């Protein structure tokens, strides 16, 4: 399925143009609105992401607010999560761009209103709620602050902060969580795979067929790319987002060939009889390797191969004729070492003989560590033997051949391969990546933190579920070596931290955990990204921060900044998330004010 060919200049150009077209359409063709500095955005990529994509109780709550004339009172909500996924200590935030598109286009269509009126829960509801309120509702009074997409984030820190009329802000909850939860989970999963595989390996996403539905497949391709994957097999995702697309053939292609007559057209470049040349090459390869007395290989049986599967050779020739400059063969249909690799080498050498450059092989089953090492060793010996026979085109075969491995690869498999040793250049990863099999949900929540400018707190027997009240400022403080030290939350009107000035950082709930930090750099995390009153998304924020390639680059840069102990798989060190001294005192006082004292008898 996957081809590890390096992306051509044409592909890169197409990807860049595709991304630019997408961003221009997102900005409504780049036209300025009447405020000049704010943008009206295009709809979400998935046309199901509308105002109606919500839970019924959001409608009933909005009705109750409206019925009690509370719907226009100003409320603030935080989108946050409480625990990092996959047993790790970091998360990649994604989904902001789609959230802003959703806000930009939030309204109930006439047919949406008519449908809601027919719902069972609407029987007791005043029709004026639908005709006068829901029919006119939009995000023109909403303000959204968000962290830049692709940022490494941590529990409790708000990813998105929504302020506006209570009725509208409540109606945004379900869809915002839908757009952020899965996107952040997949991007985090992809980033973890990239960390485990290392920077040199190519990571190829091909989970479309295993994804949870059509949108699950397209979204997974998009956010896996943001998280650090190099390409996808998903053509629709490639078209939508300009992601490089790779692909070769499946086992069925090999099985579909049985006779040389199946190949219609045998000419490749200056080679008039490619199939005949490939058969002769296989014959010479067998003779050269079996008669070699100076083999450096410890696996003599590997080099002394017998008859290979002819139908497999036929299929390889057919594919090489179709794609002489990007030939990558799946070699495990019958027997990887006894048939697949000898057949591949014969066809690859024939291509090289006539001036073409084949790409490599893919292994989709078996012991990937052992097989990759044996495949590489076979090519080294084949190259040496053919060079001794005066064939200069064999030189470089082993070095330039890319070995791609697939077969239910996940983080654990990648670590085991690294420990045992392998010769794999690229990994095709599907099921475990797109389904997030290790953890199927991130668990973002949407919590009311302020009502009519008065902070609100949600209490729980589980201290992890206690919210940090009020509208907050959020900052990341960096040390002298450039690494982030702590994320700190402040009350809305507190003085911002400054470089070189000590900041008291306190654990939100444990009194004894506190420290002074003197930052060498201060980064503001929550930025205004939607200003409904002024007409939309701030142009400066959009142009500097939004876009697939910007988010992808941000992930790479941010992960490199983090201390390695925060990123490691085994017993990672939790990153510090703190509150200011003022916010700590306020939170705990509000906690006491809202917690009834027990009566003891």
Outline where the language-model segments fall:
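Ordered alpha/beta subdomains of enzyme catalytic regions
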Residues: 2-4, 13-325, 338, 350-352, ...
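Short, surface-exposed connector motifs at secondary-structure boundaries
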Residues: 323-328, 353-359, 394-401
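Glycine-rich phosphate-binding active-site loops on the catalytic face of alpha/beta enzymes
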Residues: 423-442
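Catalytic beta/alpha-barrel core
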Residues: 161, 329-334, 358-367, 402-406, ...
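Glycine-rich beta-to-alpha transition loops that act as phosphate-gripper elements at the mouths
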Residues: 147, 209-211, 403-411, 430-432
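Conserved structured catalytic cores and adjacent interaction surfaces
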Residues: 347, 361, 368-374, 378, ...
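Catalytic cores of alpha/beta
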Residues: 339, 409-423
């Amino acid at each position: 399925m996957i081809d590890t060919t390096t992306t051509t200049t044409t592909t890169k150009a197409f990807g860049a143009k595709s991304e630019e077209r997408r961003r221009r359409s997102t900005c409504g063709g780049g036209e300025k609105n009447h405020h000049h500095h704010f943008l009206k955005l295009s709809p979400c990529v998935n046309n199901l992401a509308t105002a109606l994509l919500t839970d019924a109780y959001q409608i009933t709550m909005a009705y109750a607010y409206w019925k009690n004339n509370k719907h226009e009172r100003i409320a603030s909500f935080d989108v946050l999560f409480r625990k990092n996924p996959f047993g790790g200590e970091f998360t990649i935030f994604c989904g902001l761009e789609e959230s802003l598109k959703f806000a930009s286009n939030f309204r109930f269509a006439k047919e949406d209103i008519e449908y809601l009126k027919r719902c069972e829960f609407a029987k007791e509801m005043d029709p004026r709620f639908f005709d006068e309120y829901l029919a006119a509702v939009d995000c023109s009074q909403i303000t959204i602050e968000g962290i830049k997409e692709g940022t490494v984030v941590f529990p409790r820190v708000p990813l998105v902060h929504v302020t506006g009329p209570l009725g509208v802000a409540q109606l945004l909850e379900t869809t915002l969580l839908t757009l952020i939860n899965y996107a952040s989970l997949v991007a985090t999963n992809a980033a973890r795979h990239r960390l485990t595989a290392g920077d040199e390996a190519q990571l190829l996403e091909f989970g479309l067929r295993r994804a949870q539905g059509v949108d699950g497949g397209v979204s997974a391709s998009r956010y896996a790319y943001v998280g650090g994957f190099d390409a996808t097999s998903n053509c629709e995702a490639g078209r939508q987002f300009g992601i490089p697309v790779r692909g070769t053939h499946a086992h069925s292609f090999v099985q579909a060939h049985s006779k040389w007559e199946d190949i219609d057209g045998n000419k490749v470049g200056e080679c008039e009889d490619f199939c005949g040349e490939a058969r002769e090459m296989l014959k010479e390869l067998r003779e050269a390797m079996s008669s070699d007395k100076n083999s450096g290989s410890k696996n003599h049986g590997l080099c002394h191969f017998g008859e290979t599967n002819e139908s497999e050779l036929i299929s390889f020739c057919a594919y090489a004729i179709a794609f002489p400059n990007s030939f990558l063969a799946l070699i495990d249909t019958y027997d990887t070492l006894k048939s697949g690799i000898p057949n591949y080498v014969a066809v690859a050498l024939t291509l090289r003989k006539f001036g073409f450059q084949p790409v490599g092989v893919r292994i989709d089953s078996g012991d990937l560590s052992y097989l990759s090492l044996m495949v590489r060793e076979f090519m080294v010996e084949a190259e040496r033997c053919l060079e001794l026979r005066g064939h200069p085109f064999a030189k470089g075969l082993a070095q330039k051949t890319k070995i791609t491995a697939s077969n239910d690869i996940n983080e654990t498999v990648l670590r085991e391969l690294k420990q045992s040793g392998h010769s794999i250049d690229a990994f095709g990863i599907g099921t475990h990546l797109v389904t997030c099999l290790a953890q199927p949900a991130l668990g973002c929540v949407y919590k009311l933190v302020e009502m009519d400018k008065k902070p609100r707190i949600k209490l729980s027997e589980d201290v992890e579920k206690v919210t940090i009240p009020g509208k907050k400022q959020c900052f990341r403080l960096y040390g002298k070596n450039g690494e982030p030290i702590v994320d700190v939350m402040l009350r809305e009107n507190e003085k911002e931290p400054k470089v070189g000035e000590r900041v008291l950082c306190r654990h939100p709930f444990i009194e004894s955990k506190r420290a002074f930090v003197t930052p060498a750099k201060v980064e503001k995390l929550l930025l205004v990204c939607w200003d409904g009153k002024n007409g939309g998304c701030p142009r400066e924020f959009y142009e500097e921060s939004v876009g697939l390639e910007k988010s992808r680059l941000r992930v790479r840069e941010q992960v490199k900044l983090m201390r390695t102990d925060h990123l490691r798989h085994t017993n990672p060190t939790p990153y510090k998330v703190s509150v200011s001294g003022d916010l700590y005192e306020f939170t705990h006082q509000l906690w006491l004010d809202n917690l009834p004292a027990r009566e003891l008898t």
